[in-house]
């Protein structure tokens, strides 16, 4: 009801105000100090990790990967942290980290449920013929997911499936933002798209995707003009809105579209040293 909605919004305002009043921001050298303690008092590594967090800001993501060189350094890329994780253990490619990883993959975004494998037959034929990995963000029938997992296990295709966003309006916004970032077109039966045979022209692309149990990191190429324009529009809308619920929604969109990913490339002189560093 309207009264319930109003009450929730007022409670949200009070909780946010209390948290802002009682919280302590981690800034400047404090980041280095925390990172140094977390890496067994390795000041140099702590400083590198601190630099990574400063580079991406509050909305960014910091992750790490092994480097082929002895030096540890930070690489900044554009990308997004999408809050959906592994859907099937057979999609895992990195058994050590328990992650599903794809490089230079095509991206398929589907808002309507995929009910049978024939609906994506043209997509599968396209990526298999051209040896392109495929990231699917969609809800689908278990039988479809099982068929894809089986073909991935047999080595017929490099594929990963993660669920579509969960809720109504937010679902469409998240998919639209993912579409802008990857260059894909969202397949939506409600808008007249033919779900009987989804075509390759709907596909976008990403440089890399890493899916763990909880979420997925999607690295993309340099942000397009469309994304940059959307970011500016959201900033204007943020400055004009007064509704707490709308503020939260817009802030999430802004973070999603403008976020950076810092990759700490961990260098070492041996496999033993590399394992010891990454374990920290």
Question: Could you say what each language-model-derived stretch is?
Answer:
Residues 13-280:
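Long, structured protein-protein interaction/assembly regions in large complexes
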Residues 1-11, 15:
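Hydrophobic, well-structured modules enriched for small/aliphatic residues and gly/pro motifs
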């Amino acid at each position: 009801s309207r009264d319930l909605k109003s009450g929730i919004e007022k409670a949200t305002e009070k909780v946010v105000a209390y948290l802002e009043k009682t919280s302590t921001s981690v800034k400047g050298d404090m980041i280095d100090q925390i990172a140094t303690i977390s890496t067994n008092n390795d000041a140099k590594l702590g400083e590198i990790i601190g630099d990574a967090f400063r580079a991406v800001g509050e909305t960014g993501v910091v992750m790490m990967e092994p480097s082929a060189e002895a030096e540890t350094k930070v690489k900044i890329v554009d990308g997004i942290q999408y809050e959906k994780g592994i859907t099937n253990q057979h999609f895992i490619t990195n058994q050590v980290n328990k992650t599903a990883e794809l490089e230079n993959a095509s991206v398929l975004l589907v808002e309507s449920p995929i009910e049978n494998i024939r609906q994506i037959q043209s997509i599968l034929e396209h990526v298999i013929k051209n040896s392109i990995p495929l990231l699917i963000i969609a809800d689908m029938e278990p039988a479809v997911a099982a068929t894809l997992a089986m073909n991935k296990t047999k080595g017929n295709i490099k594929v990963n499936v993660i669920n579509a966003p969960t809720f109504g309006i937010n679902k469409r916004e998240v998919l639209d933002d993912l579409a802008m970032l990857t260059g894909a077109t969202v397949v939506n039966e409600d808008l007249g798209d033919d779900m009987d045979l989804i075509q390759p022209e709907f596909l976008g692309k990403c440089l890399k995707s890493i899916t763990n149990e909880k979420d997925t990191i999607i690295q993309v190429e340099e942000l397009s003009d469309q994304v940059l324009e959307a970011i500016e529009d959201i900033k204007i809308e943020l400055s004009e809105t007064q509704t707490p619920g709308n503020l939260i929604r817009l802030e999430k969109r802004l973070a999603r579209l403008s976020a950076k990913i810092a990759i700490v490339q961990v260098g070492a002189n041996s496999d033993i040293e590399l394992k010891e560093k990454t374990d920290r």
